[in-house]
């Protein structure tokens, strides 16, 4: 790497830091019956944020066993801030390293679904309820996920009508449906043997659940896209060696058949796990960032505003 490239990266880091206002992590389950003190939501609010500022809950990947909070968490949040978008990095529950190297969940429950979806629903609730505090638009709250986090992001839209918080006695006064979703090299299917990412399936379902046909089907997202699914942005690289791009093709097909507004971008090169990095992936795959901002401003948010306007008109007629 030459000196110019070093200087460019250094200046980029300084610029991103200047735009970002990282706040202390929030323990999202404090004061509730849920025992999950390690689940946190870290706000990154751009300087000068206004009430119209969109917000994105960021779900890092890691096969539902661990989380890449540096590249697919903090790095993404700081980049979003540089675009004037508020970000909230979610450290959701995962199976853990011991579940990866052993089979202890044959004997104890451990962490598995619906823990993860419960975490993201709670996060959407808290972000919307705290919109005034963070100077964000509560009607422009999306979820962005990478790899297994992409599965969680799409699941947050797919199962938004199911209140996973109700067993805890939590009745949100706001919607837990995201207004838009971005899925980067996502895990999608848990049933299609051609494309399934087995480690992620084991992470979210557990030792017994990974063999349960009904449970696997229930979280194969391509089979359960709802009619009211919000707009979706998808990116996958053809040379991804970790999660087959067939996952995104299945999702694209399902969204198309349901006539859900979405954009699916296929890159020839880029691999996996590049997040918003300036050095990982390829020059081609790094263009997803500009594509996402354009899609958000020109496609997703206008659709969100139109939907909100129609809902407000219905309320006025009542």
Predicted regions, residues:
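Short beta-strand element of the alpha/beta-hydrolase
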Residues: 52-61
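N-terminal cap/lid segment of alpha/beta-hydrolase-fold proteins
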Residues: 21-50
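Short beta-strand/loop motif that positions the catalytic acidic residue
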Residues: 228, 233-236, 240
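Cap/lid segment of the alpha/beta-hydrolase catalytic domain
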Residues: 64-72, 91-115, 192-201, 276-278
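Primarily recognizes the serine-hydrolase "nucleophile elbow" in alpha/beta-hydrolase
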Residues: 122-196, 216
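C-terminal catalytic histidine-bearing segment of alpha/beta-hydrolase fold enzymes
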Residues: 42-44, 100-105, 235, 245-318
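Mobile cap/lid helix-loop segments that gate and shape the active-site cleft of serine hydrolases
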Residues: 31, 170, 186-224, 230
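Alpha/beta-hydrolase active-site loop
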Residues: 109-132, 287-290
